[in-house]
Regions:
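A structural boundary signal for the start of the first folded domain, especially the loop/turn
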Residues: 2-6, 16-120, 127-190
Length: 190
């Protein structure tokens, strides 16, 4: 518990520093070069959602809930990317304020240029929403959206992820979702 709290504190400090460096002020806002004023988050800073640039890692644990498992999950995702090929990213965010987790996943996919890729999936985990429950969403790129429709993704969140998230097994939820995505892809001709 202490370790998780320390990682959450460090992640919050890093987000504040990131927001100050990228915006030049302490408001935590970020200007989108496309002119789109929608904001999504890696956390809430000064009451505003902060969205980081696309990380180089396939696992971004902004919430500090995957800390012991990141290396193994990162290695697995890189191996899958070379074998399948598909880019799967797992992102955890400490909180998203009143934001909609599905809209955030979609916006993150667009901003990180996953949307136009042939095969990319983003798995977003928010361990604590305003109502206290964990939330998750799955975003699929345009090239595989016919396989991973919104209905399919919502079903995976409800049936695969949510039971594990309710038990605070965030790594298990991410790993089970990755497994489900790969199993589904293996049953479909791309």
């Amino acid at each position: 518990m202490i370790r998780l709290g320390l990682y959450s504190l460090l992640a919050s400090i890093a987000l504040v520093l990131f927001a100050q460096c990228t915006s030049g002020k302490s408001s935590g806002s970020e200007t989108d070069p496309s002119g789109d004023s929608a904001q999504v988050a890696a956390g809430v800073v000064d009451g505003k959602l902060v969205f980081p640039p696309k990380p180089s890692m396939m696992v971004s644990d902004f919430a500090g809930v995957l800390t012991d498992s990141i290396r193994g999950l990162e290695d697995d995702l890189r191996r899958y990317a070379s074998e399948v090929p598909i880019e799967i990213m797992v992102v955890s965010m400490a909180h998203i304020g009143d934001g909609d987790v599905w809209q955030l996943a979609h916006e993150m996919g667009k901003r990180w240029h996953l949307a136009e890729k042939e095969r990319a999936v983003l798995i977003l985990i928010v361990p604590k929403s305003p109502d206290g429950s964990a939330q998750a969403a799955i975003f699929a790129s345009q090239g595989i959206r016919h396989i991973f429709s919104e209905t399919y993704c919502r079903g995976v969140v409800s049936n695969v992820m949510q039971p594990l998230l309710n038990d605070k097994n965030y790594y298990g939820a991410a790993a089970a979702t990755v497994e489900d995505v790969l199993k589904t892809l293996s049953n479909v001709q791309l």
